[in-house]
Amino acid sequence: MMSINPIVLLFALLCTLLSPFSIGQSTIIHEQKSLYQDIVVFEHQDFRCLSFTAKKGERVQTCEYQDPQDKRIYFPYVRMTLAGLLFNPKPERILIIGLGGGSVPSALAELYPESHMDIVEIDPVVSQIAERYFYFQPSHNTRVHTGDARVYIKRAGLKGQKYDFILLDAFNGEYIPEHLMTREFLMETKQLLSSSGVLVANTFSTSKLYDHESATYRSVFGEFYNFKIPQESGNRVILSMLIPLPNQQALQQQAEALTSALQPFAIEIENYPSLMTLEADWDEQARLLTDQFSPANLLK
């Protein structure tokens, strides 16, 4: 029987999953196994894409334009995370959990060159690939920490560190590490917020986990904005603060002030406030996710 290279099979599957790209016009330029996942970098027309295949079979794709002068962020769900700037438009200290191709850190570094940024990425291979293939270049104000985010956040809390913008982006499209979803973890993260800081979480909009996750965030942060883009049916962004949340009018005014600065990244920030809601659309009696009860893998 003829044997088939598993990388070829993987590539074919990736091309099938990554709409609107087609199989025949894509080229693998790098593939590598890490301790956590198989990583493939491939090109299609004017895009370069990063795909992960984890040990349990989950997959995620992120793409950037090959032209380093083209700052546009390709995927809407990635652009959505910059909605946090509506709540704190001048963050001086930024914490990002999950690097990927580095689109968001690169955008924030350009927007706020004097701000200090800490990025936590568990997989050192991802950091290497982001720099080699996706133009991610940490500035003198940016530090990439290799390790588990839960450990980093716990240690940062013990040191009394505070951040104005915290992005939880350890989301790969189908899976978030379950120890990064519990009430205990969110309490530890909440302690890192500055008095005017914003928490931004990129997560699911539809799954069996939705009710449990929403109830858990509500138990820790109280009221939060639920931000969904209709055509992005699989994603949502949760936004919350320690202080009372701004109303829709204040968000719209801030969006107008940010529109020009965010245009190069294809972020239509002026459309975001109307897509945010404070209304609960989940079972408010759902059991909270805790370190003792966090079946995230089963509920996805």
UniProtKB/Swiss-Prot annotation:
Positions of the PABS domain: 7-253
Catalytically driven reaction(s): S-adenosyl 3-(methylsulfanyl)propylamine + putrescine = S-methyl-5'-thioadenosine + spermidine + H(+)
Organism superkingdom: Bacteria
Pathway: Amine and polyamine biosynthesis; spermidine biosynthesis; spermidine from putrescine: step 1/1
Protein's GO biological process: spermidine biosynthetic process
Entry EC number(s): 2.5.1.16
Alphabetical keyword list: Cytoplasm, Polyamine biosynthesis, Spermidine biosynthesis, Transferase
InterPro entries linked: PABS, SAM-dependent_MTases_sf, Spermi_synthase
Subcellular location field: Cytoplasm
Role noted for this protein: Catalyzes the irreversible transfer of a propylamine group from the amino donor S-adenosylmethioninamine (decarboxy-AdoMet) to putrescine (1,4-diaminobutane) to yield spermidine.
The protein, known as: Polyamine aminopropyltransferase
Organism: Vibrio vulnificus (strain YJ016)
